Amino acid sequence: MKRQRGNDPPRTFVAFVRRYPRIGKAWDLLGEAGNSGPLDPKTARLVKLGIHIATRSEGGTHAAVRKALMAGSRPEEIYQVVALAAGALGLPTAVAAFTWVEEELKKAGNKRSRRADAAPPRTASDAGS
């Protein structure tokens, strides 16, 4: 398995792929295939963050935030992904994701207040976009 410094996979994942090495190899190939397209790594990481938010995957969202930061995403860009989720997925999903994102950004030292003016205001016409 490939590892990036500072981004070691969870111990349970490591144990799983040790037990099932062919699945681990297939996972690596799947990742390589998905990353071999026209999107730059930062944009791809933001898209993956949106996918994890859409599936309400808490662990996946935490990991996606860490990986987006490592790919050069700014906290404001990550928060925009969460804001976009509100219109497409509903407020409960977006609020849950906001919590997960906040937790991860605080761990990374990118503290941001929960002020209402932290992001540009959204209008009702933005909700369906």
Task: Give the positions of each predicted feature.
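Mid-chain, well-packed structural core segment of small domains
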Residues: 55-83
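Acidic, glycine/proline-rich low-complexity segments that act as flexible tails and inter-domain linkers
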Residues: 1-43, 70, 96-129
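C-terminal structural segments of small proteins and small subunits
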Residues: 79-104
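Alpha-helix boundary/capping and short turn/kink residues
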Residues: 36, 40, 58-59, 74, ...
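Residues within well-ordered alpha-helical secondary structure of globular protein domains
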Residues: 29, 50, 84-87
